[in-house]
């Protein structure tokens, strides 16, 4: 799911901004990078922490506090299944009045729910067109 989302984001010309580590983040980065997209990793520590698909590494040394940078740097947030770091990104995005699309992630009031990556991209495009994101 994450890799497909990355591919679709790249195909639509979007830049992927994420935490730049492994797991779901790496899968999304892989999909975007292998499809010619721009991938920015906002890293908790040093550049060496980045997964191999991150094209632009931003070493913050800020651990979880970097989530504020990730969200502030984004036009919208697509949340995939994750833990409390994902939850904090959702909360920050809602507080900053950014569109949040939940793709199998936390079910929180104010977020849009997508059943698959294609629907997430459709919702993102609609939010961007309407100036909500």
Q: What is the predicted role of each segment?
A:
Residues 1-40:
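Glycine-rich beta-alpha loop segments
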Residues 2-4, 25-27, 44-45, 64-66, ...:
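A generic local structural motif
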Residues 13, 54-55, 74, 97:
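Short, well-ordered alpha-helix to beta-strand connector turns
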Residues 17, 59, 113:
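Conserved SAM-binding loop
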Residues 21-22, 44-47, 105-108:
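Short, ordered loop/turn segments at secondary-structure junctions
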Residues 30-72:
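Helix-adjacent hinge/juxtasegments
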Residues 63-132:
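C-terminal binding/interaction regions
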């Amino acid at each position: 799911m994450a890799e497909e989302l990355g591919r679709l984001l790249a195909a639509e010309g979007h830049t992927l901004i994420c935490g730049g580590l492994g797991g779901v983040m790496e899968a999304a980065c892989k999909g975007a990078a292998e499809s010619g997209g721009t991938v920015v990793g906002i890293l908790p520590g040093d550049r060496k922490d980045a997964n191999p698909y991150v094209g632009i590494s931003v070493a913050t040394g800020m651990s979880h506090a970097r989530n504020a940078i990730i969200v502030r740097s984004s036009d919208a947030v697509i949340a995939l299944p994750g833990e409390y770091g994902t939850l904090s990104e959702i909360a920050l995005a809602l507080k900053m009045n950014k569109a949040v699309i939940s793709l199998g992630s936390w079910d929180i009031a104010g977020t849009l729910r997508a059943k698959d990556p294609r629907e997430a991209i459709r919702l993102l495009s609609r939010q961007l067109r309407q100036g909500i994101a």
